[in-house]
Amino acid sequence: KEWHVPVSIGIIWFLWHYHYFYQNGIEVPLLSFFIGCIAESFVYEYLLQWSEGNLLSSMTYHFSWNLCIHLFAINPADNAGNEFPYILMTLFEVSMVLLLLAHDKSRHMHKLPTK
């Protein structure tokens, strides 16, 4: 599995949102946001592969993620500046990526050899 593709997309995605930090549009920790962009890129890649290239799965995940950030007051702008929920959510997502990568590695290890 190529790890550099989701990492590159995560960096580009982070740079795409970077200007919001200077416009006071994003009040989350910069490092956590950067790590989150890369972690989410791995999830999107997994969803795209799982759904055989259907973008709807990734779009639904992105929508759900953004909805949860505001619905459950994870965004520091929604909870009096507390950054802990956002950092915790980022750690959860990194854990999910590690599980997906372990599952993917395990799945490839159990394939029968072909002639």
Regions found by a protein language model. Give the residues of each.
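Membrane-interface helix caps and helix-loop-helix hairpins in membrane proteins
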Residues: 21-28, 76-82
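Membrane-water interface at transmembrane helix exits
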Residues: 16, 20, 48-52, 65
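Generic alpha-helical transmembrane segments of integral inner-membrane proteins
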Residues: 11, 15, 38-39, 95
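C-terminal membrane module of polytopic membrane proteins
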Residues: 56, 60-115
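Hydrophobic alpha-helical segments embedded in the membrane of multi-pass proteins
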Residues: 34-46
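A loop-to-helix transmembrane entry motif
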Residues: 6, 24-37
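Membrane-interface helix/loop boundary segments of multi-pass membrane proteins
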Residues: 1-8, 46-54
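Membrane-helix boundary elements
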Residues: 3-25
